[in-house]
Amino acid sequence: YVDGTIWFHGASVGEILSIIPIIKRFEKDSKIKKILITSSTTSSSQILSKYKFKKTIHQFYPFDLNIFTKLFIHYWKPRLAIFVDSEIWPNMYNNLYKRKIPLILLNARITKKTFNRWKYFPNFSKNIFEKISVALPQNKESKKYLKLLGTKNIKIAGNIKFYGAALSNYNISSLK
């Protein structure tokens, strides 16, 4: 990951605040040269700007259209993508997979209601969820649903909003 960017994506303020301890740790890691954080809200961008990180930059998440996600990946060249909570984006996942960029779903959350929606499209769902390299769900329920939807590598990490940064001690080098 020396030459590449570590990319985090969270929808808004809550997800971004939950990864601040991880960002702080990665900021201190000399092997990590650039950290990209994307979100969909201006408020999360404003909060990030208050931290004055040196290696971390914020961009807004692109529309999940095939051409936009391809261009985004080509421009930023992430070595690792970490999506927070329930951020499931089919085109982005597919293009990360095609480029052999590992994808972690951190603090993964799938409710019964969400699961029931995904199971109406079993082939489509499997095609998306099997592209997750590692899922770190909040609880056993989310683990069960992720497995049923096609995710293979799942380890319960708890809710990082309450228990701290599970990923900060996770061996990301094993995903190379």
Question: Can you annotate each of these PLM segments?
Answer:
Residues 2-171, 175:
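Active-site and donor-binding regions of nucleotide-sugar-utilizing enzymes
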